[in-house]
Amino acid sequence: MDIHRCRFVPYNPQAINALAFSHPPSLGLGGKGVPTLRLAVGRANGDIEIWNPMRGAWFQETVLRGGKDRSIEGLVWTLDPPETGPDGQQQAGRLRLFSIGYSTTVTEWDLEQGRPKRHSSGNYGEMWCLAAQPRWQAATGKDNKPLPAAEGEYTGQHLAAGCADGSIVLLSTADDDLKFLKTLRPSTKRPRVLSVTFQNRHTLVAGYADSSIRVFDIRSGQLKRTISLGKGPTGGSKELLVWSVKCLPDGTIVSGDSAGEVRFWDAKNYSLIQRLQSHLADTLDIAVSADGETVLSGGADQRTVVYRKKSGEKGDKSSRWAEVTHRRYHTHDVKTFAVYETKNLSIVVSGGPDASPVVLPLREFGKEHHRNLPSLPQVPPVVSSPSSRLVMSFWDREVSIWRVSRGPTSLHEVPDGQRHRLVGKVMIQGEENITSATLSSDGKILVIATVSSIKVFSVRRRKGDDRGTLRIQKLDTPETISEDGARLVTVSPDSRWLCIVRPNNDICLARVKPASSPQEKTQVMPQLVNLRRAVRHARFEKVSHGTLGGYERTIRCIVFSHNSNILASGDLSGCIDTWTLEDAEQTTIKKPNTNADADESSSEDEDDYAAVEGQRWRPIASDSPIPRLKSSVALLSFRPPSPAQSNTILTNGTSASKTISAETRLMAITTEHQLVEFDALQGKLSEWSRRNPRAFLPADFKGVRDRAMGCLWDFSDSRERIWLYGTSWLWMFDLRQDFPSTEELNEVVAAEANDASDQQTQKQSQKRKRSAQDQDDDDKRKKKPNSGTGAGGQLPLAQSDVFFDSKARAFVGPDASQGEIVSLGKERPVDEEEEDEEFNENNEIQLARVRRENAKSGSGDSNQLVSTSTPARRWWFTYKYRGILGIVPLSSKSADLDADTDADADGEASANTGLEVAVIERPMWDVDLPDRYVREYE
């Protein structure tokens, strides 16, 4: 594979200003979080990223795009009260997301459509902070049963926003709305409100810019107490800025100020309990654990400091807070925290101007690794036109196109000048950021979409320009297409169909007429073909978990087959829908309904299956679609046509003579890194996918933490490879082979059988206590890549801050003749989902073994045909690339080749030439960050 390492794309990751989990910490909840748990990440350009923790896997599901001069400075989630359904049962309330951004407006976001749902603004100052009222908890009666809410009691959550004019605005979220409730003002003095939190459902605590903390009763609107922090340090400002206030479960107030101090205040009389000086610069944010035993602070000195309660000496029941440790996980300010905890999960996420969210273990701090989440988007904002050697990238409201020249083909050839050149640039009008952009495979059509509009451009090379500059001209787009925006756009490989995924996840297709001569323009037909997805049953959600509505049906990816005759889409719920293009005269549409409802919707069906220039799109097996996958669909890609013959013999002895056509095989990569290949026309698994379940994947691949971003195909007469890549890794699988091979699998089965018989014999012969080495070996064998409390894996003892192991040997008796291994750490309860996964994995292994045996017996003497040749490498991987923005293919057969070139010779050369790609990197050390605090020794 020929690789061009490119760092010329000036993509600028934006600072993280706000973090918020959709659910509050709950130590009484088992497992690693509820299914609806999400993390919202607010950035300085107005984008909001929605991350799914996935019990430690961390997957970026979608991005809510911002706009010009917009910023996210605060994020909160609320849960609406449950409603009573028609059947009398309670239905889960909706989870709602709100944001502020240095304006007088609070914005509610529509997660299903990916754009703002409503705004609330008023005659008050700019909002600097935002907090949500704690969720309503039912009181228990004498029989320990929950009591209903009192008459007239509001069980929802109000919002409190602190403003620059000193006021605190209360907003009501009742009745699925956002309305002004009241304003809290301390006095005639108007200091900025820098931080706000709730001590309980009726008490509000706010930090100001005048060295004070004020406590309000939101029911009466009265000021209960003003807490003074005193003067600032000598040589600095007289007034302290209270950047953060948080409350422990017992009501204790914790504050962080511009002097770098963390102070603890009594919950009842609001007196100072303790003050700690742990930062060299401002303390910007504070995080507290669910049990109130751990506090974290982040500052402008890049430090993350951990405090824990230290019990007094014997006879002293009082406890004091002490700094346990501090460390620099960020290269810039630590600006914001978000905490989530259950019985099995305990994490805190931090962020700042260095753009990378950092996941830290909270309960197991010092015993587990931290983890840096990617700062780059997980849907690559880069597309290429291989034949034209054009690379397109977009960010904010800008699109840039580069031309990558060919490298030297031999050691004696001298490269001529610059290897890349900027040949085109587009700045779109309006305020919305670009949601999606694509370049056709021939490099002649450019499509740019925002949340409110779609623009189509023709791309041509300027005549007489030796530099290869492009002429980008806007085309007349019909109103049926441009009047609404899109979350995804793509162009078919033959450049005849434009696919649009609307913000509400409706799929539309428009016919494109390419220009037949240089004097003509490419035309986009006004008629839209609306495609319907198969109806799927929604997953049941518990009332306490809340619901995200139709957010799970958000389309993650959409792709055409290589002959442009099949279209496939995948969504966050794991559903895959497919459609095929057929001649209108030969297509007969089956009406699923035969009652009166069918007559009413007949006109809609005709529009959905309307013919365009004699062709019609229809769903494939709408009555029995492809089964839903276990996790979200991360990638979809059709297998390209292989130049090899259909009777190719696999190197592990399996005949491919009966395999399905390569044009219809669809590869799906899930967020759990499961590779599933379907026949798109028949809706069944391919033979390769049947023989290779996820349990057979290499252990190194299953241990990869960053999720896959994209894939490339490398097909020729001698190889069938798929290349997967993430932010920091690149992996190759040879699809002509199974992994592990049949011989290796038989050896594993025999070894497992021998181990089982040996263990049974040992149990019958003697019973002994397990040694420490046996116990450690079992622990290492049982650990999974995403084990732990949600951050990184277990820290080795030599790198741990705890300085003692998690196990010790306890001796019984005066002569120490009996010993027992005792665990010093708290044993976490077993996760039921992990037990189910292990059970399903064992079933998949047994089923795959049977399929391989059947394939081997059906292939006859095929083993003898390949026994003389050495099998090629089944997989390969590397971690040498950092900050991968995307990897795009390039073609050695360019559109600029002379017309006299022999087509057959070119086809033979391209079939035998290796894959050529451009690896676009954007490491953080190449990004210009704002000024930061400089320490004395720097």
Region roles according to the model:
Residues 128-263:
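Solenoidal tandem-repeat scaffolds enriched in leucines and small polar residues
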Residues 35, 92-96, 128:
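N-terminal intrinsically disordered, low-complexity segments enriched in Ser/Pro/Thr/Gly
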Residues 86-90, 144-152, 655-656:
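Short, conserved, GDST-rich strand-edge loop motifs in beta-rich repeat architectures
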Residues 2-30, 38, 45-63, 78, ...:
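Long, low-complexity intrinsically disordered regions enriched in Ser/Thr/Pro/Gly
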Residues 122-126:
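Asp-box/WD-like beta-propeller blade repeats and closely related beta-sheet repeat scaffolds
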